[in-house]
A protein has these predicted regions:
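Structural alpha/beta surface segment adjacent to cysteine/selenocysteine redox centers
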Residues: 1-84, 164-182
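C-terminal cap of thioredoxin/glutaredoxin-like
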Residues: 1-2, 69-72, 76-182
Length: 182
């Protein structure tokens, strides 16, 4: 299985769809943090929430783009922020990340117009595909959003017809019976 990582700006998705992120809803914020910590512990994954969240990930996303979004680069950035719980969102924190990663020209890389354009285009393409959250896996124009969809995605990889049953097709056109007033 070839997994291609594509950095996007989550805030761009939220703005487009008119949604709040889970950390912007007070009751959901704590629940989400605790679940992530519990899940990581259960699966032996190093995990520590950074000093503040939500935070602006723009520099880290641009750095990933500038370094071709390899699994190694994304792993390094992800581990720094979420494995070690370090700050990469302040100027000092980002500088420390680039020192530890031995990327002396990071500020020049992330200032590049082409890097900024790629991140913007990635986000616009995600919106065009109908992506509304992260992580999302896109397989043959079929989207699987979130960790809880991993088993469904794996099932789909084994048997793409899992989503073509009569009931699955009916669900794609299910009407609404009520709408909230906003």
């Amino acid at each position: 299985l070839d997994v291609r990582l594509v950095p996007i700006l989550f805030a761009g998705l939220l703005n487009h769809w008119g949604q709040k992120g889970p950390a912007e809803i007070p009751a959901k914020r704590t629940d989400t943090y605790q679940y992530c910590h519990w899940y990581a512990t259960q699966h032996g994954i190093p995990f520590k929430t950074p000093p503040a969240h939500p935070f602006n990930p723009l520099n880290s996303l641009r750095l990933a783009v500038a370094l071709n979004t390899t699994h190694e680069v994304v792993g390094l950035i992800f581990n720094y922020i979420w494995g070690e719980g370090k700050d990469a969102y302040t100027e000092e924190g980002f500088h420390q990340l680039t020192l530890e990663a031995n990327i002396p020209n990071a500020n020049d890389l992330i200032a590049s117009t082409s890097v900024k354009n790629v991140l913007r285009q990635n986000t616009e393409q995600a919106i065009t595909l109908g992506i509304y959250g992260v992580p999302t896996f896109a397989i043959n124009n079929t989207l699987f959003w979130g960790l809880d969809r991993t088993d469904m995605m794996l099932d789909y990889l084994e048997n793409p017809n899992v989503l073509t049953t009569n009931e699955m097709q009916r669900l794609t056109t299910l009407p609404t019976a009520a709408e909230r007033r906003l």
